[in-house]
Structures are given as structure tokens and as C-alpha cells.
Regions:
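Basic, amphipathic alpha-helical segments enriched in Lys/Arg and hydrophobic/aromatic residues
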Residues: 195-248
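Polybasic low-complexity intrinsically disordered regions
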Residues: 1-98, 102-108, 113
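Alpha-helix termini
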Residues: 50, 97-99, 113, 143, ...
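Helix-centered, glycine/charged polyanion-binding patches within enzymatic domains
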Residues: 93-210
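Short, intrinsically disordered/low-complexity patches at protein termini
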Residues: 75-76, 116-117, 122, 126-128, ...
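Short secondary-structure junctions
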Residues: 79, 133-135, 221
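A general structural signal for short secondary-structure boundary/capping elements
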Residues: 86-89, 130-131, 244-247
Length: 248
């Protein structure tokens, strides 16, 4: 959010969380975008498309730094928190799980390491023959996900058969517990059809940002001071909610 302040006084101001600062990010097309002002951080309910809470910070504040403060402001905790890969940090996964919710966040490849033995490069468990195992659903009461033998599930025709790995008629099966790796082990499991379906709902956040910028004067703000900017953005959010009620 750009605010019209004398930026030549920037060197005289402290980065204390209240003064305007330069912000930088890449847009949806990968182009660099800079602005001088503040940044609005929102939590949006994907069903209504309306905000549940927000914070305002100087523009140089990283988005991920406001994830936990926003969660703490929530009156009711949702089932899922959907965030983009900029929020891919272990402290955020842990905070979400402590609140009894699930984090649906794409992996930031810069944070990745070589997968442990028994996992492919997508962090998907493989059997002793190297075949990806079949996802068999989440077990919420155990905070775990279950995988089964791809041969007995009819996904692969393993020439060794299922007895190679297990004496069970169902073949080899395994559980992964979220507490062991909350970043990679999600309920539902990362990159399954259900996981992708849930993540797609995150578009509600971008739509709301676009709406208040284009229609409610949230983009260029002609006032100074964090408290005034916060009040202005609160009015933008409130106006959007009133319009939503009227248009029902």
C-alpha cells in the first residue's frame, strides 16, 4: 500500500514497526515491484471471500513474519490455513498444528534438502522396489497418513510380488506421523488431489486484495502515519463486508 510521505526523511526514521519503509516483491509475472509505504496482511475466509482479521506493517516486513500474529488474532480457528510458498517455514507449520489446524503450503525449493532414504524427490514414500506407494488417506485421530503396497493396490505389477516386503495379504503398508516432519507430512498428504483442491481456495485472498485496491481506494493512500493508514484500511475492509451483505 503506497502512502504519500516525504521519503527523503527516511534516513532519519527508525525501523521500529511504525514508520513507512521501502517494500519489494515480485508480481505474478515475475517482475520486480517496489513501493514506499505500508503492507496489509490479511486472513480471508475462503467461503465468503471476506477478511477475518488483518495487520498493517511497514512495507519491508516479510509476509511470513505476520502469519503467526494473524493466527493469534483469529477468534475461531479454521480447519486449514492456506498460504503461498513464502510462508514455508517450520515455525509456521508448528504454530498451525498447535492450534489444531492444518497448514496447506507449497514447498519453497530453496528450503529443500535431499529426501531421506525411502522417499523420492517429491517426498513421496517408495517401496523396497522403488515404486511410489499408494496414498490410503489421513488418520486424523493419529495425526498420521497411511500408504499401501502399489502391487496389491493394482497400481504396479511388481515381479517380486507383495510377499517380498510383507507376509500380509494387503502387502506392505506404512504410516507417517505429522509430528516427525510437520513440513512435509500434511493431512491430507502433500500434493494429493484433496491437498491441491484445498490449496486452490487460496485464490480468495488475491481476489479480495484486488477488489479493495481497484474499488475501495486501498492502493494509493493520501494520509500519513501507521494509525491513520490502519484506520483507512479498516474502513476499506468494513466497506467490502457491507457491500457483500447488500449484494446478497
Amino acid at each position: 500500500m503506497t502512502t504519500y510521505t516525504n521519503y527523503f526523511t527516511l534516513s532519519k526514521k527508525e525501523d521500529d514497526g511504525t514508520h513507512v519503509m521501502w517494500g519489494y516483491k515480485k508480481d505474478s509475472k515475475g517482475r520486480d515491484y517496489r513501493w514506499y509505504g505500508y503492507k496489509l496482511h490479511l486472513a480471508v475466509d475462503v467461503e465468503s471471500g471476506l477478511p477475518t482479521t488483518f495487520t498493517v506493517t511497514p512495507a519491508n516486513t516479510a509476509d511470513s513474519e505476520q502469519a503467526i500474529p494473524l493466527m493469534e488474532l483469529m477468534k475461531y480457528q479454521p480447519v486449514y490455513y492456506c498460504m503461498d510458498k513464502g510462508y514455508d517455514a517450520i515455525k509456521i507449520y508448528n504454530a498451525v498444528n498447535e492450534l489444531g489446524s492444518q497448514a496447506i503450503i507449497p514447498l519453497n525449493k530453496r528450503n529443500e534438502k535431499t529426501p531421506p532414504e525411502g522417499m523420492n524427490k517429491e517426498h513421496w514414500p517408495v517401496c523396497s522396489m522403488g515404486y511410489p506407494m499408494v496414498y490410503w488417506g489421513a488418520e486424523k485421530e493419529r495425526n498420521s497418513v497411511k500408504f499401501r503396497c502399489p502391487h496389491t493396490c493394482g497400481q504396479k505389477d511388481c515381479y517380486m510380488g507383495s510377499n517380498w516386503c510383507s507376509d500380509s495379504d494387503l502387502g506392505y503398508s506404512m504410516r507417517l506421523y505429522q509430528k516427525d516432519d510437520p513440513r512435509h507430512i500434511n493431512l491430507p498428504y502433500r500434493n494429493t488431489a484433496n491437498w491441491k483442491r484445498i490449496y486452490k481456495t487460496r485464490g480468495a485472498v488475491e481476489r479480495f486484495f484486488g477488489y479493495i485496491k481497484e474499488n475501495l481506494m486501498a492502493e494509493n493512500i493520501h494520509i500519513q502515519g501507521k494509525s491513520k493508514v490502519t484506520t483507512h484500511l479498516l474502513l476499506c475492509c468494513t466497506s467490502a463486508m457491507i457491500i457483500n451483505i447488500i449484494m446478497r
